[in-house]
Amino acid sequence: MKKLVLLFALVLLAFQVQADSIQNTDEETKTEEQPGEKDQAVSVSFGDPQGSALQDAALGWGRRCPQCPRCPSCPSCPRCPRCPRCKCNPK
């Protein structure tokens, strides 16, 4: 009976030592810096960096260049789309 208890204690001790060594290696790999970890950057863009024509139109809607007359093809248009001096409209 004493041999069985001693054998069981040795088996438990072996499992504990093995578990401690696995835990130590896991902690070491977590604290070590992974190669290229700091260099990884992600940039996501959903459109043109200068903006889109829709954004420009939304920002300038209702404005009219003082130099430009109303558009002859569309009298209800508040801006002149053909004027070369007009900076309100994207070309």
Swiss-Prot record:
Gene for this chain: Defa-rs2
Region listing for Disordered, in residue ranges: 22-48
Job of this protein: Apparent precursor of a secreted, cationic, proline- and cysteine-rich peptide that contains Cys-Pro-Xaa repeats. Unlike cryptdin, the proposed mature peptide region lacks the structural motif characteristic of defensins. It may have microbicidal activities.
Cell compartment(s), UniProt: Secreted
The species this protein was found in: Mus musculus
Family statement: Belongs to the alpha-defensin family.
Keywords: Antimicrobial, Defensin, Repeat, Secreted, Signal
Keyword hit for Signal: yes
Residues spanning the signal sequence: 1-19
The protein's name: Alpha-defensin-related sequence 2
Region (7 X 3 AA tandem repeats of C-P-X): 65-85
Gene Ontology CC terms: extracellular space; secretory granule
Entry-linked Pfam families: Defensin_propep
Bias-annotated ranges (Basic and acidic residues): 27-40
Tissue: Small bowel, spleen, colon, kidney, liver, stomach and femur marrow.
Any single GO BP term: defense response to bacterium
Positions of Sequence repeats: 65-67, 68-70, 71-73, 74-76, 77-79, 80-82, 83-85
Covalent S-S links between cysteines: none
Residue stretch(es) of the prosequence: 20-58
Main location group: secreted
